[in-house]
């Protein structure tokens, strides 16, 4: 049920004064729907209030713009305005501090959410304990001199190593043959030519072919189980 006309005017007047800004009929009608007021009733109340001098209005073509009477409001002086600006600045500063606090709390929450749960920590602890136990068992076997490498794996590595040594020996011999031929027919000093071409012998870089080749023989002489 719609309010009576006098109640409607009171509602509309209170709304216009609270808003204290230019309003048209549609603005007021949309905002006052919660009071079950129709647009026609709002229009009638606005016109009645304007005729009574309780609000003011201006006409722009066919549209009327209504606004609260400004003489009913206390206008602050320059000192009061300055105080209001100062208070507003303090409030803005407090607002920024609150926003920062909220942001810090949200970051802390995200950080806590990204951490492991108790259940995950327990699972990780159990996994690490298992890995440590396995490593300790391997260490005990090593100390006891037990071979941890399978014989077939050991032989495969030794065969591959021997093949690489043979390739090294062949390439070393090929280089020597080619190098001897080049230096014999070159008028330049061997050392000078070597530096000019950027050639380095194994010995120049701290390598000893024989030392690596001897490892094969040493490996064959080692007793089993070591």
UniProtKB/Swiss-Prot annotation:
Tissue-specificity statement: Expressed in vegetative and reproductive tissues. Found in seedlings, leaves and flowers.
Q: Which UniProt keywords apply?
A: Coiled coil, DNA recombination, Meiosis, Nucleus
Which InterPro entries does this entry report, sorted A to Z?
Hop2_WH_dom, LZ3wCH, WH-like_DNA-bd_sf, WH_DNA-bd_sf
State the SUPFAM superfamilies in the record: Winged helix' DNA-binding domain (SSF46785)
Annotated GO CC locations: nucleus
**A Pfam family this protein belongs to?**
TBPIP
Q: Which GO terms describe its biological process?
A: chiasma assembly
Indicate where this protein resides in the cell: Nucleus
State the deletion phenotype.
Sterility due to failure of both male and female gametophyte development.
| Gene3D superfamilies named in the record | Winged helix-like DNA-binding domain superfamily/Winged helix DNA-binding domain
Domain of life where this protein originates: Eukaryota
What are the coiled-coil residue ranges? 76-150
Q: What task does this protein carry out?
A: Involved in bivalent formation and segregation of homologous chromosomes in meiosis.
Q: How does it assemble?
A: Interacts with MND1 and MIP1.
Which family does the record assign? Belongs to the HOP2 family.
| The protein's name | Homologous-pairing protein 2 homolog
Please report the organism this UniProt entry assigns to the protein: Arabidopsis thaliana (Mouse-ear cress)
């Amino acid at each position: 049920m719609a309010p009576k006309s006098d109640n409607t005017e009171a509602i509309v007047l209170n709304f216009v004064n609270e808003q204290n800004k230019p309003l048209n009929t549609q603005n007021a009608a949309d905002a006052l729907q919660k009071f079950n007021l129709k647009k026609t009733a709002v229009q009638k109340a606005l016109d009645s209030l304007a005729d009574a001098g309780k609000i003011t209005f201006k006409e722009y073509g066919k549209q009327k713009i209504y606004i609260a009477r400004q003489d009913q409001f206390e206008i602050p002086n320059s000192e009061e305005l300055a105080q209001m600006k100062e208070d507003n600045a303090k409030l803005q500063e407090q607002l920024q501090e609150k926003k920062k606090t909220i942001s810090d709390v949200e970051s802390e929450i995200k950080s806590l959410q990204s951490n492991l749960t108790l259940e995950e920590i327990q699972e990780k602890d159990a996994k690490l304990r298992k890995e440590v136990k396995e490593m300790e068992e391997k260490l005990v076997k090593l100390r006891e001199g037990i071979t941890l490498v399978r014989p077939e794996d050991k032989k495969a590595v030794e065969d591959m190593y021997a093949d690489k040594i043979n390739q090294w020996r062949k390439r070393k011999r090929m280089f020597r043959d080619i190098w001897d031929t080049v230096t014999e027919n070159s008028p330049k000093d061997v050392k000078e030519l070597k530096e000019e071409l950027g050639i380095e012998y194994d010995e120049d870089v701290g390598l000893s072919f024989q030392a690596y080749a001897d490892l094969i023989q040493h490996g064959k002489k080692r007793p089993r189980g070591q």
